[in-house]
């Protein structure tokens, strides 16, 4: 069975990092920087909340995802999985730390660079998602391309590629209400 795996352990050690998260902290509250010494000193989440009115979302997260490698973020409800993922595309600003994608510092990106990054490199399916109910699957998939003013023929080709890739071939003309929840999320 080992021969079926695409990457050996050695391959992963020498491959280039796709995503690096270094010493990432997120504290929610009115003065996150003001409590960082306490957080670095090891204060508990409960004590930080009860005595200082701040919520510790992430504490010293370090992750390296090599190219062509899949990592799974698992944890209990409320453990910070979504908070962590939202830092990669900077939907949430960290209290401290570093996020690199293709060795580019996501936190240093300008608004224009960040917008392009989100369009081309960092997609995300939200836990609670919204589809346009009056548009078909094809129209929903192509909506972002339409907004970007991609020519209609190219947009349709690209949309069909992704519809095929996620296993919705044959449902292009269906509306969201005609799909199962799992199909809608795809």
Task: Give residue ranges: language-model regions.
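Conserved ABC transporter NBD signature motif
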Residues: 2, 7, 97-105
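Short coil-to-helix segment of the ABC ATPase nucleotide-binding domain corresponding to the Q-loop/switch region
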Residues: 135-142
